[in-house]
Amino acid sequence: MTLQQEIIQALGAKPHINPEEEIRRSVDFLKAYLKTYPFLKSLVLGISGGQDSTLAGKLSQMAITELREETGDNALQFIAVRLPYGVQADEQDCQDAIAFIQPDRVLTVNIKGAVLASEQALREAGIELSDFVRGNEKARERMKAQYSIAGMTHGVVVGTDHAAEAITGFFTKYGDGGTDINPLHRLNKRQGKQLLAALGCPEHLYKKVPTADLEDDRPSLPDEAALGVTYDNIDDYLEGKTLDSAIAKTIEGWYVKTEHKRRLPITVFDDFWKK
């Protein structure tokens, strides 16, 4: 088995999907989890206005709506959380995503004050954060807020990670990577677009340039610029296609060096890092 085949198998990726079937699979997955633990009453998700959170949010609301109708439990709710750092550049996209999702409840938590307070506390301890590390601080503060909300609403935090992010480790450890349940796991980027198109999502929300937008020195830095490969390259790789050797090597390099993010926490029984 080649490394490419191993990666595809590990991430559960498929070369072709039926969007309607995958929508139903994700919705049923979320419903089944909540039904297994009836003390859980909410799904909580941060909405950024990008493709991934828009899709995960829509699937979450669909799951909650169906489960509420099936059980008669009106305590069930989907909570969409806006988590800007100050003023968000693509705020209109966030509002458009909210309008598309139609969440039961929308909360806004501005994380800037908390991030600056944490940065100042570290500075007083003699640690000056780089812009990159401050970006990770933002991602972790967003997740901290979501878990606080979930804790107060008997909820679970929904993740947006999918195969095209998992393969590159393009998420913050214990930030956007630190979630309870990931309904998009297995899908690549273009497949996520197919699901949103099938759901009737406004095109600009899934055709926009993907960006984590965490760094102050490089605002709205495209994911593809940070990774050195395009999402089309990554999707082709995950679909088993043959790529230029340099591109494949870059993708595989990301996979190997970010393995620690996909195995949390590392224990004495792990040896992947020795290879």
Curated annotation (Swiss-Prot):
It comes from the Bacteria. It catalyses: deamido-NAD(+) + NH4(+) + ATP = AMP + diphosphate + NAD(+) + H(+). GO terms for biological process: NAD biosynthetic process. Pfam families: NAD_synthase. The keyword Membrane does not apply. Its EC number is 6.3.1.5. NCBIfam families: nadE, PRK00768.1. This is NH(3)-dependent NAD(+) synthetase. It comes from Salmonella typhi.
